[in-house]
């Protein structure tokens, strides 16, 4: 099991940041590796909500995501599965700070098959990818007021 963690400050209210991230269908707007993401359960977002995401890096493989913990606006817990590639479990935490939100993440990544051989590389690459993704989110939320209109 590999751990990937980090944090970032976002100059937006904690409720806005939480709501935007909790709706996984927003992720293609700030994660260039996610082609699209669809909510496959009905009802409001919460524990049990599931998504299917199409990633560039996995070719035809779908990433199945399920929300396993939901405490608005402080905690979002999920698990993701990419068949034959990896499982990811983790949490994103949100803290109100002066001027915005401190967002921290921690993922446990379990590679499968030949991906297990790339363990240390997955950790380094994963850390860089997460920093890139969350920095892109920060830029989107801080510079584009219309980004939150869809929430």
Question: What annotation goes with each model-predicted range?
Answer:
Residues 21, 31, 67, 107, ...:
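Hydrophobic alpha-helical core bundles mediating ligand binding, dimerization, or RNAP-core interactions
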Residues 109-151:
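A conserved amphipathic terminal alpha-helix motif
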């Amino acid at each position: 099991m590999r751990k990937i963690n980090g944090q970032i400050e976002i100059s937006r209210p904690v409720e806005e940041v939480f709501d935007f991230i909790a709706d996984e269908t927003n992720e293609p707007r700030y994660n260039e590796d996610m082609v699209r993401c669809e909510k496959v359960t009905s009802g409001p977002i919460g524990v049990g909500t599931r998504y299917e995401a199409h990633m560039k890096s996995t070719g035809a493989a779908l990433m199945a995501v399920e929300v396993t913990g939901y405490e608005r606006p402080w905690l979002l817990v999920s698990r993701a599965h990419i068949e034959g590639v990896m499982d990811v479990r983790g949490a994103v935490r949100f803290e109100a700070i002066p001027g915005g939100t401190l967002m921290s993440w921690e993922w446990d990544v379990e590679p499968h098959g030949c991906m297990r051989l790339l363990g240390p590389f997955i950790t380094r690459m994963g850390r860089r990818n997460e920093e890139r993704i969350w920095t892109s989110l920060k830029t989107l939320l801080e510079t584009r007021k219309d980004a939150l209109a869809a929430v």
